[in-house]
């Protein structure tokens, strides 16, 4: 009898845990708690708290979904998904699933809320817009498996 990583029968749990029950709620509550943490800092204004929340969220999104490759539970030598980012492994690579749509919509909605609360101030708009573009482009189906400028090729 062989033991499968994760103990629940899936060869690569990386592909399905984001679709698990309660993940979306936990994700949004975590995002809200980070924002409230920024708001609780005495010298941070509301626009800066929104900008910091947006930039931190997008940086974490970019790193955890589009930079890290492979699955932590599998051997790196024999794992066929070792060259895929976490985003490319979600739902076994199937495009436009509800999980992928949710993870694409959250940065966009957060950007729109940030624009609303910063009143489209150029000082806040430019970094927020750049981070939105950087975190949204890799999510498009046309970029599945594409490594721009050979970044993150290996």
Curated annotation (Swiss-Prot):
The keyword rRNA-binding does not apply. Ubiquitously and homogeneously expressed in the syncytial blastoderm and during the cellularization stage. In stages 11-12, it is expressed in the germ-band layer In later stages (stage 14), it is mainly detected in the ectodermal tissues. In imaginal disks of third-instar larvae, it is uniformly and homogeneously expressed in eye-antenna, leg, wing and haltere imaginal disks, which is consistent with the former ectodermal expression detected in latestage embryos. It is found in: Endoplasmic reticulum membrane. One of its GO terms (biological process) is regulation of ceramide biosynthetic process. InterPro entries: ORMDL. Its main location: endoplasmic reticulum. One of its GO terms (cellular component) is endoplasmic reticulum membrane. Keywords: Endoplasmic reticulum, Glycoprotein, Membrane, Transmembrane, Transmembrane helix. Glycans are attached at residues 14, 120. The chain crosses the membrane at residues 23-43, 102-118. It is a multi-pass membrane protein. Negative regulator of sphingolipid synthesis. Belongs to the ORM family. This is ORM1-like protein. It comes from Drosophila melanogaster. The gene is ORMDL.
